[in-house]
Amino acid sequence: MVEGLLAERGIDLCYETVRCWANKFGPAIAANTRRKRGRADSVWHLDEMVVSINGQRMFMWRAVDKEGEVLDVLVQKRRNKVAALKLLRKLLKNQGAVPKAIVTDGLKSYPPAMKVLGCVDRHQPGRLRDNNRVENSHLPVRRRERKMQRFKSQGQAQRFVSTHSAVYKSFNTQRHLVSRNTMRKFRSAAKAEWNAASAAAA
């Protein structure tokens, strides 16, 4: 798509060039975007899903707030206490505060990890429907995974989901729920946010 848009403007390049740009600038743009959004909401939703990477079964750990904003994504080989602890430590470091509640599914790896960090009292384990917000957050990645014919390595998967999760929220607007004028405002705000993040990454 990017290749076609640039071709219309007389710029000839191949998809490999676009891929290299994404690998080089994507992580920095994603980091700048997250930094400008500030601290997350006081309720976190955590979940993990299985992904196939080069024929190997791995797990994509994801955290979102109650507004659906992706806080972090980690691709890991295990679904155990150590993996849960790694995600929680990264979240606490980046957010700078313990949330009022941490909602998860029934995975038994979460309670011992939270006990280590002293936040087990914030844990709210629930049924699948109680964590629909983070479950729905997996769907865009599933769609991209199919289009990309699976991820080739853990590093590639981590780079993609980190960048995608930071940028997707800005440009994903439910058009059928807003007026045309509101849609224009959302797009202008998203473009301004993107320009600021990409300028800082250049």
What residue spans do the PLM features occupy?
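DNA-recognition alpha helix
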Residues: 1-11
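Mobile genetic element proteins and their domesticated derivatives, centered on retroelements
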Residues: 2, 18, 47, 63, ...
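Short, basic alpha-helical nucleic acid-contact segments in DNA-binding proteins
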Residues: 12, 20-42
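Active-site beta-loop-alpha junctions of metal-dependent nucleic acid enzymes
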Residues: 24, 73-96
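Two-metal-ion RNase H-like nuclease active-site motif
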Residues: 40-53
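A short, conserved beta-strand element enriched in hydrophobic/aromatic residues
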Residues: 60-64, 69-79
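RNase H-like two-metal-ion nuclease catalytic core shared by retroviral integrases
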Residues: 126-146, 157
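C-terminal domain-tail junction helix/linker
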Residues: 145-147, 158-202
